Amino acid sequence: MNHCLLAISAVYFKAKWLTPFEKEFTSDYPFYVSPTEMVDVSMMSMYGELFNHASVKESFGNFSIIELPYVGDTSMMVILPDKIDGLESIEQNLTDTNFKKWCNSLDAMFIDVHIPKFKVTGSYNLVDTLVKSGLTEVFGSTGDYSNMCNLDVSVDAMIHKTYIDVNEEYTEAAAATCALVSDCASTITNEFCVDHPFIYVIRHVDGKILFVGRYCSPTTNC
């Protein structure tokens, strides 16, 4: 008799923004899922805050990147293509080397930020992906698990489940943040409006990538 060994990996991330979004500034806003189609999303907004930002020009496309820090040692990097349908070419070139280069180009500036509230859940079988990457000896009848147990077992599925919830998560410290905005009212600000598909990368301060995903529409995880 063959006994099936099911390997399960789960990722959960939730953290408070270092500079929280005020719920009173959240409102419905058009989000372009394609150049010809848009839907309304709950768009979070903050004004005149200081964030690391860069406008990047590459042969495969131009985009903007911003770092939104969390309390603690993590931050979310948002990569927004200049073109509404420019996400795929950036994804294809999202290598470790390129990502580090883009992060090194960041400069602090005052920015008005608009980004959707979103929840992303997913469940994926990683077997095909891992086999394509060369990890073939652990799956099916070729796997040798004699050091783990005396049964005839095989790994037939590797399920990866994800969940991320991005919302305002503001605290009492938000009042002090508002004071900073008024102090800097005369400062020239830029705008980072996430109104079409984007990539988000959650990373640790030491550079380790904790989570990578994309948001294409409020109705699908794409």
Swiss-Prot record:
One of its GO terms (molecular function) is serine-type endopeptidase inhibitor activity. One of its GO terms (cellular component) is extracellular space. It comes from the Viruses. InterPro entries: Serpin_CS, Serpin_dom, Serpin_fam, Serpin_sf, Serpin_sf_1, Serpin_sf_2. Belongs to the serpin family. Poxviruses subfamily. This is Putative serine proteinase inhibitor 2 homolog second part. It comes from Vaccinia virus (strain Copenhagen) (VACV).
